[in-house]
């Protein structure tokens, strides 16, 4: 029967019995993709509205004869070593089709055959050299393969792979079917990590000694193919070298042996003066990371399809060649003053540039391409350098200030980021290309941390507080003292002095810190950075200085003159102050005070460079401000029913605040609006609402409150803890 044109519900009278209809599916679908079966009933009536009555039975649809073929699996491992010279490890694994745990259903068992092995070996090649050389050469080699053969053909998922192979007419067909069905992965790696010369104890290590260096090398290779990917190759080359040396110089103390300072405690700080001429440590590292990836998707083989008529799929290649280096210098100028400098540069080796120079074929897919131009350091893509200075103020050497501990820290950061290659092709209306425009940014952080340990101060002054005595014992002691002192004339004076000492030693600890962060971002910067970093645009800028460099950079020709350049110059400033204090009047009673103030301001500005002159355009300033305050005066104000008296004050204060704000402004004398508020300062104006809220909830007079929310001094919050009630 011709099935090219099948009419739905076609009547087939030749079918035996009561089967009058035949349903068919056009094409060759895979039964493995069936998720749902639908059964329908056809209405045989040809007249609408006919009364119908029928009974339909659907027997249970069940799959019978499930193949519950069992499988097996095995795992093997072999470990060996040759003393401490070499180690060897090999593992193998096999599992057949149908393998699974005893509680798995037939459908949950594996539908593939797995064969896998891995071999790993480590050899300390340095032991082959004389021991006095002190060579450390750890060689590692690893290889492995994984072969996964499915039970069913990946394309015809309802046909077993073995059956399809048996029906193939030629050996070449069987090879093509088998090759596209098997999931195959091969791995190989060779590495030399931490090659170095250890100290043999023969002499003092110098900054140029070979013991300060170590070298690393690693090569990784992976080959993979499966049903979708005809071939995927990934080659990875890693090389690196590190240098590190710590100078062992003693600090110079010019006044340490001056004996006259020993008898004068206020001059003893001179004995502690010290400085170092040599840095503390010097570090550097270089890393090469090259990745080459070749991939080609598979053109699936099908019987009856001429492969020569199919459009070939392209080879995809991805290369990522990186060259990174960094260095660090640490110098303890003295025991209290420490200096650190770090710089890191990441470079990209451009493939196009190498092809133009004849170094590499840009379409070369062989792994030997990893070694082409190995000495090429590429073009800088990102440069970061950090400068930090830490100073511990010498209060501990001053007798009357020894209870103060203070530290100042300064950190300056500089970053150079290369511009986008894609955006460099943008052309203005006048035909001027944008080119490579870089971005520079810097910031600095200043932090001053201070702690006051009043227990040291009280001890130095000879004051001893009774606040550590439990409350009930103090009561008993006070009664005993009163009984004994009542017999003396100076009893009241002694009791008063005791109370005075307790009052003077209430404060146990005070801490305060202030930090400030400033930064700027300048886009459109044209110069690159040198191999060892950069000192442009100025030395101060690279160390975090916020001196304005925009006009000087434009005058020097360092900023792009592209007429359609629209990236913004930005500046940021933030400051944070925190303070805390702890009072302990008696044991079990602790009062903590905390105050803080935060301020942040950002400024964005568009600009244009005309004739090497910086021309600022529109700018935008925004920020945040927060400060602790005390609301104790209004926290317990009574409420009138569902109305809050503080909120009512807030509403009524708005007119008074608005009348004060309009003074000495262009809106003064312009009258009032329909609600009685001055023009420009309505009842919902931001400044009116903010100052009215502060006056209402802090309990201040709206006619006297400062009309600026950014006040200088924060008011502390407090927390009261009572833990000594059980001692009463």
Regions found by a protein language model. Name each.
Residues 1-51:
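Extracellular beta-strand ligand-recognition surfaces/modules
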């Amino acid at each position: 029967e011709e099935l090219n044109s099948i009419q739905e519900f076609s009547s087939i009278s030749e079918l035996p019995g009561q089967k009058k209809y035949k349903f068919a599916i056009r094409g060759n679908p895979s039964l493995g993709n069936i998720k749902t079966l639908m059964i329908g009933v056809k209405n045989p009536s040809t007249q609408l509205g006919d009364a119908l009555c029928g009974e339909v039975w659907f027997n249970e649809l069940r799959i019978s004869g499930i193949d519950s073929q069992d499988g097996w699996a095995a795992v093997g491992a072999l470990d060996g070593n040759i003393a401490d010279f070499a180690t060897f490890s090999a593992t193998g694994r096999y599992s057949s089709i149908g393998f699974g745990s005893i509680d798995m259903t037939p459908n949950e068992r594996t539908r593939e055959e797995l064969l896998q092995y891995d071999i790993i070996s480590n050899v300390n090649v340095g032991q082959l050299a004389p021991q006095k050389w002190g060579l450390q050469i750890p060689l590692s080699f690893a290889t492995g393969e994984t072969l996964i053969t499915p039970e069913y053909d990946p394309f015809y998922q309802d046909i077993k792979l073995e059956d399809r192979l048996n029906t193939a007419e030629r050996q070449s067909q069987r090879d093509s079917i088998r090759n596209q069905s098997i999931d195959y992965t091969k791995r190989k790696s060779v590495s030399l990590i931490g090659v170095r010369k250890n100290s043999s104890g023969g002499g003092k290590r110098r900054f140029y000694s070979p013991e300060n260096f170590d070298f690393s090398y690693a090569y990784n290779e992976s080959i993979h193919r499966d049903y979708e990917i005809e071939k995927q190759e990934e080659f990875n080359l890693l090389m690196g070298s590190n240098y590190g040396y710590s100078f062992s110089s003693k600090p110079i103390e010019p006044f340490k042996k001056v004996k006259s300072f020993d008898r004068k405690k206020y001059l003893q700080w001179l004995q502690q003066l010290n400085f170092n001429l040599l840095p503390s440590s010097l570090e550097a590292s270089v890393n090469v990371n090259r990745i080459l990836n070749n991939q080609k998707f598979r053109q699936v083989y099908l019987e009856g399809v001429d492969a020569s008529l199919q459009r070939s799929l392209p080879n995809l290649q991805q290369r990522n060649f990186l060259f990174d280096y960094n260095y660090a210098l640490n110098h303890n100028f003295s025991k209290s003053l420490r200096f650190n400098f770090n710089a890191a540069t990441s470079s990209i080796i451009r493939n196009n540039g190498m092809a133009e120079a004849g170094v590499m074929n840009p379409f070369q897919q062989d792994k030997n391409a990893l070694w082409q131009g190995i000495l090429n350091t590429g073009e800088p893509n990102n440069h970061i350098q950090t400068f930090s200075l830490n100073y511990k103020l010498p209060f501990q050497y001053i007798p009357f200030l020894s209870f103060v501990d203070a530290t100042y820290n300064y950190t300056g950061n500089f970053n150079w980021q290369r511009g986008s290659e894609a955006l460099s092709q943008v052309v203005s209306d006048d035909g001027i290309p944008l080119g490579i425009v870089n971005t520079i940014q810097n910031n600095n952080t200043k932090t001053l941390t201070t702690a006051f340990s009043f227990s040291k101060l009280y001890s130095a002054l000879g004051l001893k507080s009774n606040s550590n005595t439990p409350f009930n014992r103090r009561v008993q002691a006070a009664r005993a003292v009163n009984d004994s002192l009542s017999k003396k004339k100076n009893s009241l004076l002694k009791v008063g002095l005791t109370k005075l000492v307790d009052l003077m030693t209430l404060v146990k600890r005070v801490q305060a810190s202030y930090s400030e962060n400033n930064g700027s971002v300048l886009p459109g910067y044209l110069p690159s950075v040198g191999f060892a970093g950069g000192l442009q645009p100025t030395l101060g800028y690279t160390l975090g200085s916020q001196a304005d460099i925009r006009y000087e950079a434009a005058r020097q020709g360092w900023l792009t003159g592209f007429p359609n350049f629209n990236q913004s110059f930005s500046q940021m400033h933030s400051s944070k102050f925190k303070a805390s204090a702890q009072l302990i009047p008696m044991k079990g009673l602790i009062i903590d005070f905390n105050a803080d103030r935060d301020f942040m301001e950002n400024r964005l500005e568009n600009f244009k460079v005309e004739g090497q002159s910086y021309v600022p355009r529109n700018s935008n300033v925004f920020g945040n401000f927060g400060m602790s305050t005390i609301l104790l005066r209004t926290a317990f104000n009574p409420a009138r029913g569902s109305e809050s008296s503080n909120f009512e004050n807030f509403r009524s204060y708005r007119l008074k605040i608005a009348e004060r704000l309009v003074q000495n402004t262009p809106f003064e004398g312009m009258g009032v609006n329909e609600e009685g508020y001055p023009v420009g300062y309505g009842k919902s104006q931001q400044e009116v609402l903010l100052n009215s809220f502060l006056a209402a909830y802090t309990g201040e007079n709206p006619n006297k409150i400062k009309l600026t929310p950014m006040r200088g001094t924060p008011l502390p919050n407090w927390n009261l803890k009572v833990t000594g009630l059980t001692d009463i």
